[in-house]
Swiss-Prot record:
The keyword Cell cycle does not apply. The keyword Repressor applies. One of its GO terms (molecular function) is DNA binding. The gene is hrcA. Belongs to the HrcA family. SUPFAM superfamilies: GAF domain-like, Winged helix' DNA-binding domain. It comes from Lactococcus lactis subsp. lactis (strain IL1403) (Streptococcus lactis). This is Heat-inducible transcription repressor HrcA. Negative regulator of class I heat shock genes (grpE-dnaK-dnaJ and groELS operons). Prevents heat-shock induction of these operons. Keywords: Repressor, Stress response, Transcription, Transcription regulation. GO terms for biological process: negative regulation of DNA-templated transcription.
């Protein structure tokens, strides 16, 4: 445990270092701490022994350590107030009507990246828990078909394909009815199981050439089992990272790996998660911060930013909290529209 004054000193060192990016000495703290310079130095020695601050080789001042940042985030930081300027920018970005879920997520990602200068990610509710609420097939011409899958979150997945030679339009109608009877209403995780157990047996009863029908099932629904990540500011990594840039950019461009990272640190009931110590050596000096947001009556999505360990945590977490609140508000409007017998407009 540290004393209240030591907590204030740590808070100031973290805040000042985030603004000035130079080591902080005891004289810099005198105006804000009601204690002598000697007392402040002694408290700084205690914080250093605890591993919360550390000395820079080129200066007598101190800078926060990874443990210090972690303590600050978990015990000191306050998120009660937003910057009025940040609030104005976020509200302006979300102004207007949204008719596609993807547009809301893109706006959130761009707002996060724009305000923090970091790489940002937006992730929908876990795919496995989403429900298939509707399925339609539309003949585009005598050979081409468009399948339209709608999930409970309002997300729409479309897939255009060539009708297999062995299938007629009547077969296609049977196929569509099978999907509606056996898959619509189920969660994605249950659909995955059904496609591998029940569907092959059912297909044998209705179709002469089963291989092409089973391939069609796989073609249409394979994309359903892949989560989509909305990203903004990938190139921002070059503004705050100096080592292993090629590996980092490769990671940030690999949605599947980033999905794994985000799901790994948010796999609990906490609304916010901060990961300082990463197993990957090229992520050693970076912090991953994730904030869940409410998707009304449908679960939780996730906002994530990745930046340097010495980032301004107070502002970054405040911006995350602000965007999460505004996004949830806009999602409420979106779902009221969607539930009112309207459909998401898909490209």
């Amino acid at each position: 445990m540290i004393t209240e004054r030591q907590r204030q000193i740590l808070n100031l060192i973290v805040s000042l270092y985030a603004k000035e990016h130079t080591p902080i000495g005891s004289k810099s703290l005198l105006d804000s701490i009601q204690a002598s310079s000697a007392t402040i130095r002694n408290d700084m020695k205690v914080l250093e022994k605890l591993g919360l601050i550390q000395k820079e080789h080129t200066s007598s001042g101190r800078v926060p350590s990874v443990s210090g940042y972690k303590y600050f985030v978990e015990n000191v930081i306050q998120l009660d107030e937003f910057s009025q300027n940040d609030l104005f920018k976020v509200m302006k970005a979300f102004d207007g009507d949204f008719y596609r879920l993807s547009d809301l997520f893109k706006t959130a990602a761009k707002s996060l990246s724009g305000l923090t200068g970091l790489t940002s990610f937006v992730l929908n509710a876990p795919q496995r828990d989403q429900q298939l609420v509707s399925f339609e097939m539309v003949m585009l011409d005598s050979h081409s078909v468009l399948s339209v899958i709608t999930l409970g979150t309002g997300e729409v997945r479309t897939n255009q394909f060539i009708l297999p030679k062995s299938m007629t339009e009547a077969d296609l109608a049977v196929f569509s009815n099978l999907v509606k009877e056996r898959l619509v209403g189920k969660k994605v995780i249950d659909i995955h199981y059904t496609l591998r157990t029940e569907i092959p047996q059912i297909v044998q009863r209705y179709f002469k050439v089963t291989s092409e029908v089973l391939q069609l099932f796989e073609s249409i629904f394979d994309d359903l089992f892949k989560e989509r990540l909305t990203v903004a500011g990938r190139k921002n990594i070059f503004d705050y990272a100096t080592d292993n840039l090629a590996e980092l950019y490769k990671l940030f461009s690999d949605d599947e790996r980033m999905l794994h990272e985000i799901r790994e640190i948010t796999n609990n009931d906490e609304m916010r998660a901060v990961k300082f110590d990463n197993d990957e050596k090229y992520m050693k000096n970076l912090t991953i911060i994730s904030q869940k947001f409410v998707i009304p009556y449908r679960g939780f999505g996730t906002l994530t930013v990745v930046g340097p360990v010495e980032m301004d945590y107070q502002r970054t977490l405040s911006v995350l909290d602000l965007v999460a609140k505004v996004l949830t508000m806009k999602l409420s409007d979106y779902y009221r529209y969607l539930d009112g017998n309207h459909y998401e407009i898909s490209k």
